[in-house]
Every structure is written in structure tokens, then in C-alpha cells.
Amino acid sequence: MAEMKSPTKAEPASPAEAPQGDRRSLLEHSREFLDFFWDIAKPDQETRLRATEKLLEYLRTRPSDSEMKYALKRLITGLGVGREAARPCYSLALAQLLQSFEDIQLCDILGQIQEKYNLQAMNKAMMRPTLFANLFGVLALFQSGRLVKDKEALMKCVRLLKILSHHYNHLQGQPVKALVDILSEVPESMFQEILPKVLKGDMKVILSSPKYLELFLLARQRVPAELESLVGSVDLFSEDNIPSLVNILKVAANSVKKEQKLPDVALNLLRLALQENKFERFWKEVLEEGLLKKPSYTSSYMCFRLLGASLPLLSDEQLQLVMRGDLIRHFGEHMVVSKSQNPLRFIPEISAYVGTFLEGCQDDPKRQFTVMVAFTAITNQGLPVMPTFWRVTRFLNTEALQNYVTWLRDMFLQPDLDSLVDFSTANQKRVQVASLNVPERTVFRLRKWIIHRLVSLVDHLHLEKDEAVVEQIARFCLFHAFFKTKKATPQIPETKQHFSFPLEDGNRGVIVSAFFSLLQTLSVKFRQTPDLAENGKPWTYRLVQLADMLLKHNRNVANVTPLTAQQRQAWDQMMSTLKELEAQSSETRAIAFQHLLLLVGLHLFKSPAESCDVLGDIQTCIKKSMEQNLRRSRSRAKASQEPVWVEVMVEILLSLLAQPSNLMRQVVRSVFGHVCSHLTPRGLQLILAVLNPETNEDEEDNVVVTDTDEKQLKHGEDADSDSEDSKNSESDVDSEDGEESEEEDRDKDVDPGFRQQLMEVLQAGNALGGEEEEEEELGDEAMMALDQNLASLFAEQKMRIQARHEEKNKLQKEKQLRRDFQIRALDLIEVLVTKQPEHPLILELLEPLLNIIQRSMRSRGSTKQEQDLLHKTARIFMHHLCRARHYCHEVEPGAEALHAQVERLVQQAGNQADASVALYYFNASLYLLRVLKGNTTKRYQDGQKLEGADIKSEPKDSEVQTTSCLDLDFVTRVYSASLESLLTKRNSPLTIPMFLDLFSRYPVICKNLLPIVVQHVAGSSRPRHQAQACLLLQKALSARELRVCFEDPEWEQLISQVLGKTTQTLQTLGEAQSKGEHQRELSILELLNTVFRIVNHEKLSVDLTAFLGMLQGKQQKLQQNLQQGNHSSGSSRLYDLYWQAMNLLGVQRPKSEKKNVKDIPSDSQSPISTKRKKKGFLPETKKRKKLKSEGTTSEKKAASQQDAVTEGAMPAATGKDQPPSTGKKRRKRVKANTPSQVNGVTVAKSPAPNNPTLSPSTPPAKTPKVQKKKEKLSQVNGSTPVSPVEPESKKHQKALSTKEVKRRSSQSALPKKRARLSLVSRSPSLLQSGIRKRRVARRRVQTP
């Protein structure tokens, strides 16, 4: 331990002679020093580094040889600890220590390591730790950065690593790898000297291990002349060495299986092949014909990683060789076969390699373009294997991106199938289908992928830099989605583009869906500002202008779906309306209308018949909206005439919401946010009709939820892109599921009609055989006829089951679409509540939203869409509606209806089966109260400046009624009925927090409801309801807002009523038998404590003497229940509440009594204690009997009597004025109940600690004064103190004999004495010697 001591302190001769402060500081320094080594071995890297830094700082600031030696010893020992994860931590710490203290010799450290972990003396059990300790020791010396400068230590480490390399079973190739790392940094002269010692001249040895080959490649790179003199001229890529290289690469691939990285030897071989111009032989013969001849997944992944790592090293010709060989086809097959959930999928790694390559050659667009085209050309029957959304495209520079987009466009128009590296999987080759091998299918799959890749490119573009590319892609998609060329013209470049394969309808549908996806990307990613886009126009507007220009060139361009005259007229009117809106472009509402028009106008080309009518209605609504905006200054004389255009607009927006388009959903939200201020009741009912389940079920056909062709196309794309393996597996699973569902349907609903038909067929078969030959077998003709009839019957039944199953799936799908449409329709409700919280129509949303919540809560275990609908509705209702800062103020005409709605909501809350649903209804009623009350609550809160009785009282009830629409009497009756329901019904959905929220918001209502609560505190109510009433009353009385509503006499009268009710319940305190009764006792004491605090704080003239006597009479019962373990989970809480009440009445809980409550042993013969014994305790019969002390001297008796007088004469004192402990608690506890005699005079015993009382002169509600210390000393010296008055029920305790008290005191003192002896036995020798001397002296005195 001398090494662990701080060098700043002189080493003490012994612990006894060291001062206390010096010994403490020495221990602290030692503990701090030792903690460093514990933290170094922890798995958290930050903790290890922090501990290492602190250790180095500690050693720098306290330079001491002993601590340095100990640190080195601990770190060297840690190199071979049993926990393998800690060995590298100690190695790194040792390296940093050697790096910081360069005066430490490396040879000495290496010698200590070899001495601690001797390779010659190790046994079998210590072999692995010894080997790793030597290896990590060498690594520590190398990581310190000083090994290459110390030749002697370097040679020793090389020899040690050479010895360790023979233990391959434990260390694998780590020693040779460490040797390669060391030699890669040594000077060339030293390398030449070490090389003959570590590398033999035999090529068989070199080609036997990846590490030896890596050492050979390192020597060939650094000292080729010395290597040639040692090995000779070697052609590593000769025909003879190719098999050995293949085997070495296989071993290297298996060695990095867990690390999932490229072996260094493979990359070094690639560099050597490039250097010697033998790359083609290496790639074809070693990789493609060697490793991939019978590939394993480790060899395949090594080849894939080598492909990615070789990209920056290859020339254009070599890139063409690599990207069109067998390896790239094997890579493509892996991409197709591996699933997205497969952890071995290689797409993240190849993306990292390609991204690094593209980022590194930003100034070479040709190489970027070549690599992108090469990876795009890897196709499986025409479908490229790379994902359409590939993040590496963001590294393309402008020229490479433009060339790549041009190549994609040309491949879409005139596919060059010969330039593709196409392949088929094993299953595709096995299952040869003639329809799948035609060029048309290959072109269809290729074009579908290309159009999605073009759209995905826009996500990675910067508009400022690549605006031309974005416009080129958008024009291409728009033209080929909706138009076709009649005659080429130079004004439209797209007309010069010709297809080598005709564009099929399937491809055109893909282009249409991709075009609207592109609109979504452009609207979200590129939100135009005037300084970014041409003339500050959004992309949608520019595309509409392009479409208008194409429509005008009808000689050169034709629509794919021709427009009628009416549809063309609707388009022209839209363009004129856009010009009108353009003049008002500064208004946000005009911008929203413009965006809606543009989007619906583009949908005119997709579905002309549907969009034409919608387009006309939108224009009509926009014009009427603008006209009403101009006439806004007029009077509201025509306010009763509802603006029909708003209702039409709502219908339009609802129909647009039915389309599964996120872009359309955003536009609808934006437009509705600008028109919702003009919303009418009829318009709101149109929205609520979608959300209302009753009308929605009956009118399902009113709003058609479209399941667009986008999903079907996506499904077809997935079906085409999947491999045959997935097809087969999915078909098997589907067939199994179909069989199981059919069996379930057959078992679940047996058709009686089918059973009757089956019986008729069987009877007809029997009749065909003849009535007289019933017991004989049927003939062949009869059997054939019976089989045919049965087969047709079962076929019909199977068709009926299949039809029912399809009908069930159809209904389920329709239900999902309907729920999804309702979720979208909630967007309009959310916009209305957020944008117009003061709109009168907001009040009509309460009950419809509550109906949705109630219905969804009833079916909460259903689909995810039901859950989403519930969560969104609840969020809108609670956060945006009930908790909104603003609300409607114009409710005077409908105040009576609102009061009726409050009553209805409160009654519905009380009738719910679920408390969570009742909470929503109750909060809705509170929201209506807030609306009815208006701004009066805010005015009262502004006047609340003071506390207690000095606060100005709130205005009277009549004032409240005159300043707001709230009918206080009516509301009081409503909530009093619900409060009665809470405090009387057995299972009420109403809860205490609901009424606490009501009381805190509306204290005037709370004042009117308090008599009901006080009435249920006692009486014939259930104990649980009484406990709820006490809790509600306690929280209400503590509220500051309630006190403002009471005058001082009213408040004092209320407190007296509460105390009178609690007196009835206190009669049974401590006699609880059930859980509800016990909860009532806890609640009544908490209420009493609150009332006592109010009385003391406000100094109310309330007499509490009766409560003092009543509580003192219950003390013994409560203490007995606590000792016996009755209701053990809450007895201590009840006892604490009791003493809190006594403390508020002026009686302090004695400290000694509080200790005795925990230390009193339970009686083993008690019937309650024998019911259930605690685990881990011996029974009474197995315990050793305690020895009784018999020889007690008179001196000991006198001392105990004097201590008893000291404690017994001491009155109750408050905690803050209590004198500090003198260290004699044990003797005071033992002798507390002993009658004291001083000089032969018996001193009157003070009240027992269990029964503290007040003197007659002390006021009942005030704490008695604390006696001073000198008075206590005078009592000890012989003066007789004045004994306070004790209750009659407690005087029987004075009849206890002195003998019994002595016996109990001696028995209770024995365990504590033994505990103290055990503590002494663990104390230092100095303390033990002093205690031993005092113990011997005491024995001598006690011996007669």
C-alpha cells in the first residue's frame, strides 16, 4: 500500500500516530488514484478516455516513483485479465502513458510484460491470457509511437511476434498483422535488416497465409531490391500461382466475416496487378473464374467490396471490362434475390463506394457519367437492379447530370437493349415462359424504371444550379403523359422525339402518376420566391402555360384523351381566371385559389369528364368570393342570405380530398383556410355528414372514394420487379392462406340449404340403386351419376363461399377507404378550429366530435385506421378546441340552447361506461361554461392581488349574471346532480379530477356545490364515497380562488361545518376493517390537517379543544394497529397523518417514541403475527435464548434513574428548538420508562412518550412554550417538576412494577449491546484497544 499513497504526504509511522485530517486526505487520494484503473476497464469509450487522461494528469502533478511503478504494474496486469473486453483498454492506456513519459524505457516495460506473463512457464489454463497479454503489450509499445525509434525494443518485439505467430488457434493472424503494421512504419534501412528474419525465401510459405502474402507485398512495395535478393524474381500472377492466390483470398474473406470489410491483402493484390499491367488476368482468372466459380457468400461479398474499392483506381477501358463482366452479373443477381429485410443485402455498401467515387471526381464528369450509366445498365430482364431513388446522384456535377438525363431520355424513347448487361436468375432460367422473353416486356420494364428515376433525380437537385434540368424533366413527363406528336415543329423540341417501340398505355399511365408525383416534389421542395424562379411563378403555373401552348399547336400536337368543346372552354375560362387572380397576387387567398385552379386544371388532362364540372364550379366560387370581398363594407342586412358559393366550394374540396394525393390534400387545406371564415351551417353540415357514421353509412354513394390507378400500377410494378423466387414463395403462402380461409368459412357458416341439397342428392343416389336392395352396393352407373351430382353440388358451394369471401374483402376495403376519407375530412375541421376559433359554428362541432370519439373508443381494438381517426379527433378536440385561447363571444341569442347543451353533456358524461369517454364530455361542458361566462373570469383574476382574509371578495352572483350569459343557478343544479351521482353511485364514470378542474376554473360554482360535499363527508354514505368527499373538500379548501368568494363570517361558518362533520367520522378512527374504511381514515386526517392549517394561518376563532381530546384518545389504538401490522401498507401513513394533526394542535411527536415504533418487537404469540411469518426469519423455537443480566449494582441503578428523570421531566419540544443529541440515545431508550429516585425522593413521572398532553394553562390551538435547558438541569438536581395532567385512560400505566420495567429494559438492551460489540470488532486497533480497556475497568467495578 505504500505505492498507493500520495507523494505530497509524508508516510506516517502508524495509523494511530497520524492525525485524523492527514489520514482522511491520504485515503481520499488513494481512492481517487485507484478509481482510475476501474474506469479504464469500463466498456464505455468516453469513460475510458476520461480515466486515462485523469491518470496521466494525476501522475504529472504528483511525480512519485511509487505511484508510477504501481500504475505500470496495474496496467501490465490488466493486459491479461480474464475479462477479454478490458485488455485493449489497458493496452491503450499503457500506450498513452508511455507516450507521455518518454523517460520510461520500452525494453524495461517489455521485460516486465514477459516476466509477468512468461511464455515458457505458462500452463494450459493460463495460455490464452498469457498469449494475449504479450500481444497487447507489443501493440501498446507500437501505439506509443516510440517503438520504431528504439531499435533494441523493436527487434525484441519482432522476435516476440514471431513466436506468437505459432499459436494460431488462439491468436489467429493477429501477430503477423501487427508485424506488418509495425514494418510499414519503420525506416527503410531498418526494414532491410529485419526482413530476412521475418520472411523466408520459400514462395510456398509466402503463399500459404494471407498475412505472409501481405508481408511479401509490403516488402515488394518498400524494398523491392532486398526482396528480390531474398526470394528472387517472382511473377505472382503466373498460371502456377493463380490457385494459391484464390485460396488465400478465400481464407482472407472468411477471416473478415464478422468485421464485414475488405481484406487488405485483396486491395494490395489489386494495386500490384494494376502496377504490373496484369489487371485483366487478375480480374478474370482470380476473381471471376476462381472465386466466383463456386461462390460462397463471403467470397461474393469480398468481390463486391473489391469492385467498389477499385472504381477510383481504374481507367475507362478497365471500367468497361469490370462493369460488363461476370462479376457484375453476379452482383445484379444478388441484388434481385436478396430481400430488403436481409441484413446481408449489399446496397448500402455499394452506395457508399459509389458515392465516395463520385464525390472524389467532381472535376471529371465523363467518369461520373460512365459509372452511373454502367450501374443503370445492370438489368434483370429489362428492369435495372439499382433502386430508382439513389442518393449518390446528388454528387453528380451539372455536366454529368445533364448527360445522364439525356441518356435516360434517349433510352426511354429508343431503348438500346444490346447495351444492357441483362441476366436472368436461376429460377427464371428454369421456368421458361414465352410471354416473358419478348422485347416488348423488357422495354416496358425499362421505361417504367427510367421515368421513376427521372422524377427521383429532382429530389437531389438544387434549383438555383439545376433549374434547366428540372424544367427538362418536367416538360418531358408532361408531354408524354398527355400529348402525342402529329407533326414535328422546332418550336416544340419534344415533337422531334420518336419512339422505336410504341408507347404502351401501361407506360403512359406510369408517366401520368409520375408526373403528379413530380408536382408534389416541386411544390414541397421548391417553394418559389420571386428571386428563385422565372418571373416568380410556381412550377405548376409554368407547366400549365406549357400545356396551354401545346393545346394551341393542335396541328402539331394532339391530346392522348381528346377534349370536347365544353372541356376546352373550361380550360380557356380557367386561363382567364388565372390572369384575374394574377392581378391580386399579393393576397394569400388569391394565391391559394390560383394553386387550386392550376392543380385541377392539370387533372383535366387525366380525367376530363370529372374535372370539367369541378373546374367550372371552382371558377364560379372564386368570382363570388372576390365580389363579396369588394362588398364587405356594406351593412349586414343580407347576412341571412347564405353565400351558396361557400357550400359549393366545400363540396368541391371534399371531392378533391377523396383522391389519394398528398399534394391535393395540402392544397385543399390551404384553400379551406382562406374560405372558412365565410363558412355557413349548411357548409359545416356537409363536412360533418362525412364524419357522422349514421348518415355516412346510408349515403355511401354521395362521396366516391377513388382507388386510383396509381396503386394498381404500383402493384403491377412490384409484381414485375420481383424475382421468380419471391413469386413462388408468395403463391405458396397465398394458396395456404386461401385454403385456411376457405376451411374457416366452411366451418364457420354451414349453409342449411346446402345440407338439404346434399341430402337430396344422396337420397336420389340410393333411389337410383333400387328400394329393395338398400343394403347392397350401388352399381357403376349409379356411382358415376352420384359422383357427378356431388361434384357439381360442391363446385357450386365452393363458388358461393368464394363469392362471400370476395364480398367480405370488398366491404372491408370500402370501410378502410371510408375511414381514410374521414381522416382527411378531419383536416378541414382542424383548419376551421385553428384559423377561426371565435366562429359561432365552432360550438356545433362539440357533439359530432364526441360521437366520433365515443364510437372509436368502443371499437378501440380494431384496425390502425380506427386508431388514427380516434387520435386525430381527440387531439383536435382537446388541444385545438377545449384549450384554445380564443373562443366565441357572440352567444347571446343562443344562450338558452347552450345551457341545455351543457346539461345534456353533463348527463351524457354521467351515463358513460368508460371514464375516459366521460372525461371528454365533461371537458366539453367546461368549454361551454367558458364561452357562456365570457371575459369575467379574466377580470376577477386580475383583481386577485392579496392572500388570506385581506383579499377582496369576488362580485356577487347577481353581478356575474349581469356581466355574462351564464345562468349560475341553472348550472349549479346541473353540476350538483352530477356531483350527487359521483358521491352516491357505486360505479360512476365521473372522477374527482373532473370536479377539481371545475372548482379551479369556476370558484363561484364551487362555492355553491360545497354544501353537497360537506354533507357526504359523514353520514350513511359508503366509506369510499366519504373518502372521495374528504379529498374533494380538502383540495377545494386549499384553493386560493375559493377563499375570494367567501366573506369572513361565511368562511368561518364553513370551517365549523366541516369540523362538525369530521367529528362524526373521527369516532371510529383506528377501527377500519375494509380497504374503503381505511381510505376514509386517511382522507379524513388529511382534511383535518388542511383545516387546522387554515385555522392557524388565518387565526380563526374556532375551538379545537374537543379534537385534541378525541385524537389523544385514539393514539393507543393507532399505535396498536401499527405494531400488529393491520393494513401494513397504510398504517404508517395514517400514524404520520395523526401526528401531523397533533403537531398542528401543539403536541410534538416525541423523537424517542418515533424510534420505538420501528424497534418494538412483535409478540410471537399474537394471533395476527402468527398468520403470516416474514421470509428469512427463524421461528421463535429456533432462536437462542437471551441471557438475562442478574447482577446489577446500585451505581448502575442510580445512573439509570437519573437518566430517566432527565428524559421524563423534559416536556414536548418542537423540532427546531430541540437540543442536539449528546450521544446517549441508547441508554435513554432503554431506561425511558424507569421511575427515577434522586436522593431517596421519588420524582413524579412525566407522561409516557406515547401520551403527550398539554398543561391546563396552555391554549389548545397553540404550541406550548419550550422549557429551557437550565430548567431541565434543575429538575435533575432534585427539584420536583410540575406534572402535567394526564388522561384517565392512561393512568393505569403507572401501576407497572419496577421489576417488570427493569426486565424489559435489560432484554431490549441486549441486541443493541451486541450490535455495538460487532461494530467495535470492525473498528481500527487503536479504537479497539481503548474500548477494551474501558470494558475491563467496568468489569472490575461490577465484581463484588
Swiss-Prot record:
Q: Which Gene Ontology molecular-function terms are recorded?
A: E-box binding; sequence-specific DNA binding; transcription corepressor activity
Q: Which UniProt keywords apply?
A: Acetylation, Activator, Biological rhythms, Citrullination, Cytoplasm, Isopeptide bond, Nucleus, Phosphoprotein, Repressor, Ribosome biogenesis, Transcription, Transcription regulation, Ubl conjugation
Biased-composition ranges, Basic residues, are 1170-1187, 1301-1316, 1331-1344
A Gene Ontology cellular-component term: cytoplasm
Record-linked InterPro entries: ARM-type_fold, DNA_pol_V/MYBBP1A
* Chief place where the protein resides: nucleus
Q: Which residues carry this modification: Phosphothreonine?
A: 1193, 1253, 1258, 1280
Where is there biased composition of kind Basic and acidic residues?
708-730, 1150-1161
Q: Where is this region: Disordered?
A: 1-24, 696-752, 1150-1344
One GO BP annotation of this record: regulation of G1 to G0 transition
Q: Which residues carry this modification: Citrulline?
A: 1322
Region (Required for nuclear and nucleolar localization), start-end ranges:
1154-1344
N-acetylalanine PTM positions: 2
Where on this chain is Nuclear export signal 1 (motif)?
238-256
> Where exactly is the Glycyl lysine isopeptide (Lys-Gly) (interchain with G-Cter in SUMO2) cross-link placed along the chain?
1151
Q: What does this protein do?
A: May activate or repress transcription via interactions with sequence specific DNA-binding proteins. Repression may be mediated at least in part by histone deacetylase activity (HDAC activity). Acts as a corepressor and in concert with CRY1, represses the transcription of the core circadian clock component PER2. Preferentially binds to dimethylated histone H3 'Lys-9' (H3K9me2) on the PER2 promoter. Has a role in rRNA biogenesis together with PWP1.
Protein known as: Myb-binding protein 1A
| UniProt organism field | Rattus norvegicus
